[in-house]
Design a protein with these regions (language model features):
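Class I S-adenosyl-L-methionine
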Residues: 22, 41-44, 83, 107, ...
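A generic structural signal for alpha->beta connector loops
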Residues: 27, 49, 89, 113-115
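Generic beta-sheet signal
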Residues: 33, 94-95, 119, 146
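NAD(P)+-binding Rossmann beta1-loop-alpha1 motif at the extreme N-terminus of oxidoreductases
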Residues: 1-61
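Rossmann-fold NAD(P) dinucleotide-binding segment
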Residues: 57-68, 72-110
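Rossmann-fold dinucleotide-binding core
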Residues: 108-163
Length: 165
């Protein structure tokens, strides 16, 4: 079990991760951050998390698992906002479909001691937004993890064994 899961972005994939995490009891608490107040209010109304904030750095403080669930184009500004708040030993992952670009742009920004394990759940629907998620979205689906060479195998195993996707 993770102590704190921080989800940055709460659309279809992020909200499905939140729901699956709750259903499977994979994290003690879920922190949610998004850039739009209306989306955050919707996530709160749906009860998707335990804490809600427009400040991504606030969401990741104390998190042992952080998953970027924003569009890939937002990764760099999000990473710049959260990098100093990431805890040593935390796992940082994502749900984007492109890995080379993500690893090249974010990898150098990941603080020492943080385990960067990009992921790609092979799942989705034509719907979007917090209300569109459902915990079974990942059932029977692959999630490809793409850790960089030298990534701590214990961290990879922890994410793989505890994965909600």
């Amino acid at each position: 079990m993770f102590n704190k899961l921080a989800l940055i972005g709460i659309g279809l994939i992020g909200s499905s991760i939140a729901r699956a995490t709750r259903l499977k009891g994979l994290a003690k608490t879920i922190a949610i951050s998004t850039r739009k107040a209306a989306t955050l209010d919707e996530a709160r109304a749906l009860g998707l998390g335990d804490s809600y904030t427009l400040d991504a750095a606030e969401a990741v403080r104390g998190a042992d698992l952080v998953i970027l669930c924003t569009p890939i184009g937002a990764y760099l500004p999000v990473m710049e906002a959260i990098r100093d708040a990431l805890e040593p030993g935390a796992i940082l992952s994502d749900v984007g479909s492109v890995k080379g670009q993500v690893m090249a742009s974010l990898g150098p920004l990941v603080p020492k001691g943080v385990h960067f394990i990009p992921g790609h759940p092979i799942a989705g629907t034509e719907h979007s937004g917090p209300a569109s998620g459902f915990p079974e979205l990942f059932t029977g689906r692959w999630c490809v993890l793409t850790p960089a060479k030298g990534t701590d195998p214990v961290a990879v195993d922890r994410l793989d064994r505890k994965s909600v996707v």
